[in-house]
Amino acid sequence: MITSRVLRFPRKPFVDLDYSRHMPAAYVERTKRTVPRKVFGDRFGAPDIKMYYVHPDDYLPSHRRPWEDKQLSSHLQRSDKYFSAQLSNKYFELRRPKSERMPDTEWTFFPGDLVQVMVGKDKGRQGLVLTISRDSSEVVVDGLHTRLGEDMEGSEKLGVDKTLRWQEQPLSVSKKQVMLVDPNDENPCEARWQLNASADEYIRVSTRSGYEIPIPSQAKVTYEYLQPENYIEVEGKDTPSDAVLERTYMPRVASFEQEIMEEMGIKEDRTPKPTFWY
């Protein structure tokens, strides 16, 4: 009875809208270097001791994706410093500002949204969101809040002239450095999630005017496709959903070795020796 009621609740698809939603979670954690380096188990009932490359509490979030080359090299350097601090029995200096991840139900920014910058030299200007970072609760706006920086660091050592370009800097959502634009009057506003009139889907509305702020199509872009309806399955490589959902495993009171022996037609005539536990 309770299960049927839960299944009738409207889904919250905005929680899953992320570029890496189809990437294996284990791969993303490895690029962040927040996985155990070694696990000391079999401690007679005591919890396992885990030695991390970088403890998840000490992870340094960024507006860049963790698998990008520059960010990955930064994570590798940080994990080496973290490990050397453990070997020398010293405290690891974090030297980073505290940033808390906003709850998924409160996050209302997606790539392609029209937003307005509230701080800096571009205060009051509007632009489109390029990328978002859920870990650091930051967004990058196309062509706004920029800073002049090197296009490729260390290029002069390779005999290439140093080139400069304007680079977009992240804007914090939790500090309200950037706000959504209300489609009613094109002024900055805050947004919230609420059920639509038929109570079967969550929509994003402005808290000031109550107008719906539609989710842009760019928010559905993932590593696998640009739009889910345009995705084409590759025969021989993509497993069809019908084959994935087909139930083929039948639980039996037998070990893995016994099941293999039955399939191969092997009969066991030997009598096992008694086993004693102390």
UniProtKB/Swiss-Prot annotation:
GO cellular component, alphabetical, reads:
mitochondrion; ribonucleoprotein complex; ribosome
Report the locations given in the UniProt record: Mitochondrion
**Assigned keywords, A-Z:** Mitochondrion, Ribonucleoprotein, Ribosomal protein, Transit peptide
The keyword Ribosomal protein is annotated on this UniProt entry: yes
- Any single biological process term in GO: translation
Write down the InterPro entries for this protein, in alphabetical order.
KOW, Rib_uL2_dom2, Ribosomal_uL24, Ribosomal_uL24_CS, Ribosomal_uL24_KOW, Translation_prot_SH3-like_sf
Its domain of life reads Eukaryota
KOW domain boundaries: 109-142
Q: Name one GO molecular function term.
A: RNA binding
Residue ranges of the TM segments: none
* Pfam families for the chain: KOW
UniProt family annotation? Belongs to the universal ribosomal protein uL24 family.
Q: Spell out the protein name for this chain.
A: Large ribosomal subunit protein uL24m
Give the organism the record lists. Answer: Caenorhabditis briggsae
